[in-house]
């Protein structure tokens, strides 16, 4: 069993925060038949982590951070996802290699237009959201090996040839992990958004 782990990092930076959604992305799965006589007996796994591409919202007069506790003028929204990202088969239809894509999508960071860009409070709120980013990335990194092992355990038991029903079984495993990642992420980020943390943020910028 081989697991290869790659990171897809956005050049513009990636943000994540307390307003979350879970999604198991269903897409057309590319399946390639490869005649590789030197393959190992067990399938290989390739995992890519996607940190997402953020959209910044600051000019929106209708500040909407519903669901974010003690946001203090800023919040983020993000969708967690996990999906099959390609399958290579042997000539007899057994899985030789399977790819997974695990990450964040539809990432938005919103800061109230009442906070002037470059002001002390604007910078403090932005710094707070960047800390949320670090927590989200740790969730992805933490769960990726466990997800890979769980999917491989399922794949190794699948009889050839691979069928759509079997692919759906893998999707179900991925969806369960998306829910788990979301729950753990919520717990970790809620610790950052306590009343004490909110008061500390406000105290950094006395009028």
Each PLM stretch: what is its role?
Residues 1-7:
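Bacterial N-terminal signal peptides that target proteins for export
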Residues 7-15:
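Bacterial N-terminal signal peptides
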Residues 17-21:
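Sec/Tat signal peptide C-region and signal peptidase I cleavage site
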Residues 29-113, 154-207:
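Metalloprotease/metallohydrolase-associated module, dominated by Zn2+-dependent proteases
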Residues 104-106, 117, 122, 126-127:
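Extended, surface-exposed interaction regions
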Residues 124-136:
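Active-site recognition of the HExxH zinc-binding catalytic motif
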Residues 137-148:
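Membrane-interfacial alpha-helical segments at the cytosolic side of multi-pass membrane proteins
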